[in-house]
Amino acid sequence: MPISKQKWIAYAQLMRFDKPIGTLLLLWPTLWALFLSVKGMPDLSILSIFVLGVIFMRAAGCVINDYADRHIDGAVKRTSKRPLATGAATPEEAKWLFVLLVFCSFILVLFLNTYAIVLSFIAVFLAFIYPFMKRYTHLPQLFLGMAFGWSIPMAYGASIEALPLECWLLFFANLAWTVAYDTQYAMVDRDDDLRIGVKSTAILFAQYDNKIISLLQIVTLFFLGLIGYLSQLHTSYFVVLFLATLLFVYQCKLIKDRERESCFKAFLNNNYFGAMVFVAFLFGIFFDKL
């Protein structure tokens, strides 16, 4: 029996193909790691595998997230129109779609070295457990940070078969950044989450949310600056990184009054930060070769 057009649309929405921001936020640190690990242009086959892997795994993460939240999404204004909440897709379909996406990702990983294959099992584990953490801890954003950042050690493993200090500095820079921007995202849903009993850093940080987000952003910049110093990147890296800092200043102004629309706008702005840091790495790496 052929799949209807409505089902294809529901599956695409389950995978968030209509909202690419999450894919971009996962892609940027992956690109940082791929270029920084080799201090130049990564192998095109490895680059292609990781870009496709980002698309598949982000889609898988969205599907399992909606499956985990299928009983509460209908009670939250922002998520009430998701396919599982409306019945456009079934939980059984979501489970099979998740398995298919993880399988496709694993097929891609098999074209990498053993180092990356071993690390990929941790990636799947983190992607699977993250959606359920909001029921047990106020720190689900920390688990998202680990899940979104695990592409960094995988990139190093695939490229140089080693996980040097630089790799972990980049991982923790991304971890702090992810917790910061996902807290901004959680601020949008805070009232609904309090009502239905879902946990988040936005609830945990309470009236200190703005200050802690700013602190996390400072930590992100510190680690990125330290990477540039230890890796002896070209001065242009630090110039572009400074310009990226201005985006954090802008975000702090947006979330100051904790309005839903402004917090969501601040969250979306992080795409530009990730892109600017990527440009900073390109300048720092390639200008040094001139």
UniProtKB/Swiss-Prot annotation:
EC annotation from Swiss-Prot or TrEMBL: 2.5.1.39
Cited CDD domains: PT_UbiA_COQ2
Keywords from the UniProt entry: Cell inner membrane, Cell membrane, Magnesium, Membrane, Transferase, Transmembrane, Transmembrane helix, Ubiquinone biosynthesis
Catalytic activity as recorded in UniProt: all-trans-octaprenyl diphosphate + 4-hydroxybenzoate = 4-hydroxy-3-(all-trans-octaprenyl)benzoate + diphosphate
Gene Ontology MF annotations: 4-hydroxybenzoate polyprenyltransferase activity
Transmembrane segments: 21-41, 44-64, 84-104, 106-126, 142-162, 212-232, 235-255, 267-287
Xref: PROSITE patterns: UBIA (PS00943)
Membrane topology recorded in Swiss-Prot or TrEMBL: Multi-pass membrane protein
Keyword Iron: no
Gene3D superfamilies attached to this UniProt entry: UbiA prenyltransferase
GO biological process: one example: ubiquinone biosynthetic process
Names of the cofactor(s): Mg(2+)
A GO-annotated cellular component: plasma membrane
Pathway: Cofactor biosynthesis; ubiquinone biosynthesis
Coiled-coil blocks: none
Biological function: Catalyzes the prenylation of para-hydroxybenzoate (PHB) with an all-trans polyprenyl group. Mediates the second step in the final reaction sequence of ubiquinone-8 (UQ-8) biosynthesis, which is the condensation of the polyisoprenoid side chain with PHB, generating the first membrane-bound Q intermediate 3-octaprenyl-4-hydroxybenzoate.
Homology family: Belongs to the UbiA prenyltransferase family.
HAMAP family: UbiA
NCBIfam families named among the record's database cross-references: ubiA_proteo
Annotated protein name in UniProt: 4-hydroxybenzoate octaprenyltransferase
Organism per entry: Pasteurella multocida (strain Pm70)
Organism ancestry: Bacteria, Pseudomonadati, Pseudomonadota, Gammaproteobacteria, Pasteurellales
